[in-house]
Amino acid sequence: MQYRDLRDFIRILEQRGELKRITAEVDPHLEMTEICDRTLRREGPALLFENPRGYSIPVLGNLFGTPGRVALGMGAESVESLREIGKLLAFLKEPEPPKGLRDAWSKLPIFKQVMNMGPKEVSSASCQEVIIEGDDVDLYQYPIQTCWPGDAGPLVTWPLVITRGPNKARQNLGIYRQQLIGRNKLIMRWLSHRGGALDYREWREAHPMEPFPVAVALGADPATILGAVTPVPDTLSEYAFAGLLRGNKTEVVRCIGSDLQAPASAEIVLEGVIHPGEMAPEGPFGDHTGYYNEVDRFPVFTVERITQRKKPIYHSTYTGRPPDEPAVLGVALNEVFVPILQKQFPEIVDFYLPPEGCSYRMAVVTMKKQYPGHAKRVMMGVWSFLRQFMYTKFVIVTDDDVNARDWKDVIWAITTRMDPARDTVMVENTPIDYLDFASPVSGLGSKMGLDATNKWPGETQREWGRTIQMDADVKARVDDLWSQLGID
């Protein structure tokens, strides 16, 4: 399904009973978080707060609060069908050479579709209906949430940050939270390996004394938002991927103050710069771990201009102990990851990121084991193949007779197929999320791999146990008898 913009998506959700308009006055300071959190935990609807206390701009919350709504936002009708998107990304990430002329012709439409999905620049856009510049810029006029009692202040939580490194044609889109510290000042909290931070670092090396242009889109269409959090190949822009999801090119408009291109249908666009050397302490804020993060210093984003629709909608969320919206996104995107991993490692049967593991900190992999030590190869592959799993602390690998998504099955495999000394892999001094206060050094910590597979000769000298299974004919006979037994 195609959505022209965020409002079109809101309309469809409302028709499906997946969006609730809240007319009662609700405070963006803490109250919205509590309401959204209770709603998400009940797998409830997206919420449009039409009367935020002290503000005239409505707030959209809990938009991606169920995996089903994430799938809808990506143009799919079910979470299961997201695997087709994963297969497309796997093909684009590592396209195999054609096996012959017929195979080449069969793949040509896919390549043509991708090549034709570059963004389309338009000369006028709804996101520039109203222009606010200079001293008129006042971010305090927007209903930016303060999510938790111990937060340092209001936090922009769904910003689509648009950057471009020096001499690069491709723009980067990423979601990096921003703390409000002044009428025109936000702290840009991006991790050092993320695309925006890499663009900024390259800019400083090439232009050390010049300000770095940045644009931030708030309330883009769902395909563009979700494209920014999907493992898109480096050769494919997030705008092009959003076009593939949508079935139409992403319309963009050139920013007034820079050459950056923002989504034309966005509700609000912040234009500005990061001045060389301007940093500020960020935090603490309640995070997706369920804890407040420690204070750290990040660049300051100076907003020089705001462009927006005449009556904009502010898109917001909160993060906290799972389940929260990032955890729900992780559940849905899990289905996208599976085909990408299977393309590189065909022996993988399933891959699961338990939402209780803060979206990415633990992974469970089931596989068709083929040789001794195979599980360890898969562990290393998970940690190294996709940058999304750079921070995954625990990888559990087991055989394909185990259901990766059933903890009873997984715990059974761990406790019956593992020797702790032999089957535990420890890797020290690896990149770790700086929010992980359990690591001994900020940004650097260890990883653990658990080989819960059946052991082959060479891995053990003992006779390995055989799993107990009832004969199929006995099970069939009991099925026929069951209604006569009076047990149910």
Curated annotation (Swiss-Prot):
What is its pathway? Cofactor biosynthesis; ubiquinone biosynthesis
- Residues involved in prenylated FMN binding: I175, Y176, R177, R189, W190, L191, R194, G195
Compartments reported by the entry: Cell membrane
Q: Keyword Lyase on this protein?
A: yes
The free-text note explaining how the cofactor binds reads: Binds 1 prenylated FMN per subunit.
This one is known as 3-octaprenyl-4-hydroxybenzoate carboxy-lyase
Task: State the organism named in the record.
Answer: Hahella chejuensis (strain KCTC 2396)
UniProt keyword list: Cell membrane, Decarboxylase, Flavoprotein, FMN, Lyase, Manganese, Membrane, Metal-binding, Ubiquinone biosynthesis
Membrane topology of this protein: Peripheral membrane protein
